[in-house]
Amino acid sequence: MSHLAELVASAKAAISQASDVAALDNVRVEYLGKKGHLTLQMTTLRELPPEERPAAGAVINEAKEQVQQALNARKAELESAALNARLAADTIDVSLPGRRIENGGLHPVTRTIDRIESFFGELGFTVATGPEIEDDYHNFDALNIPGHHPARADHDTFWFDATRLLRTQTSGVQIRTMKAQQPPIRIIAPGRVYRNDYDQTHTPMFHQMEGLIVDTNISFTNLKGTLHDFLRNFFEEDLQIRFRPSYFPFTEPSAEVDVMGKNGKWLEVLGCGMVHPNVLRNVGIDPEVYSGFAFGMGMERLTMLRYGVTDLRSFFENDLRFLKQFK
């Protein structure tokens, strides 16, 4: 054990000269491995008297601890130097553009709904909603639609049973609103509606917006003025607009509204009319005192006309190439 101090000094010198972690590990094995110089010193204890062995073992362990501490310190130095060298080599060009984060956008039909709600909100209309699973009273009977009307046929309506169905229009919201509150009433009712049809211009589910005003002294002139302002605001053009006589069971007189397209042809955009007296009576409103007008329009239809979309089904196919056009 007389040369123990020399072994420690030799180990520390080798540690300080190690140029990388691999070389340092070789030094560790040489001095502290199973057959290392300091490890083998423990075998000399058997040559000592029993009473001297504990003190001698403590001295050897102290020497090993000094070498281990030197190894740890040098390893930290080498790892730090390697990290600094790697960071210096891996320079970052801060002038390069970053990765672009894709922002989402509103669906074109949602944009149309928001635009219409904003316009009518400025006119004092509030948004009303109702159930999509409706009963035949609110969807048909209260709206003056008789039992023999084609809309009640199985091929046009999704029926659950004899009285429950997927609503074919949001007009049921008007009925529920008129039964729940007295005039004056001024609402719009956006929502999903369902009809058994599917082709280039029809889908089984689509979005509809209906409007309703009930008050005293409401006339067809009020209806025409409101819809003129709305259509010119929505399309952002001084459109040529015409009201064409039509028939709806729940309005009298009734009309369909057309706008002149860029191709010189009339395009139907919505239906409207004065609320039928029978509808007012069905909800407990006196038609001798109050009158009103109502209108309804398909959101997909208006969106197609506004953005020049030719196939209604494009709105439901989730094709990002199509949807990104409307950001």
Curated annotation (Swiss-Prot):
Pfam families for this protein: Phe_tRNA-synt_N, tRNA-synt_2d
InterPro entries referenced in this protein's UniProt entry, alphabetically: aa-tRNA-synth_II (IPR006195), aa-tRNA-synth_II/BPL/LPL (IPR045864), Phe-tRNA-synth_IIc_asu (IPR004529), Phe-tRNA_ligase_II_N (IPR004188), Phe_tRNA_ligase_alpha1_bac (IPR022911), Phenylalanyl-tRNA_Synthase (IPR002319), tRNA-bd_arm (IPR010978)
Listed GO MF terms: ATP binding; magnesium ion binding; phenylalanine-tRNA ligase activity; tRNA binding
Subcellular location: Cytoplasm
Keyword terms, alphabetized: Aminoacyl-tRNA synthetase, ATP-binding, Cytoplasm, Ligase, Magnesium, Metal-binding, Nucleotide-binding, Protein biosynthesis
Positions with a binding annotation for Mg(2+): E252
Catalytic activity entry: tRNA(Phe) + L-phenylalanine + ATP = L-phenylalanyl-tRNA(Phe) + AMP + diphosphate + H(+)
Biological process terms in GO annotation: phenylalanyl-tRNA aminoacylation
Gene3D superfamilies: Bira Bifunctional Protein, Domain 2
Record's GO cellular component terms: cytoplasm
Cofactor note: Binds 2 magnesium ions per tetramer.
Domain of life: Bacteria
EC number(s) given by UniProt: 6.1.1.20
CDD domains membership: PheRS_alpha_core (cd00496)
Needed co-factor(s): Mg(2+)
PANTHER family per UniProt: PHENYLALANINE--TRNA LIGASE, MITOCHONDRIAL, PHENYLALANYL-TRNA SYNTHETASE
Family: Belongs to the class-II aminoacyl-tRNA synthetase family. Phe-tRNA synthetase alpha subunit type 1 subfamily.
Quaternary organization: Tetramer of two alpha and two beta subunits.
Database matches in HAMAP family: Phe_tRNA_synth_alpha1
Protein name per Swiss-Prot or TrEMBL: Phenylalanine--tRNA ligase alpha subunit
Organism of derivation: Shigella dysenteriae serotype 1 (strain Sd197)
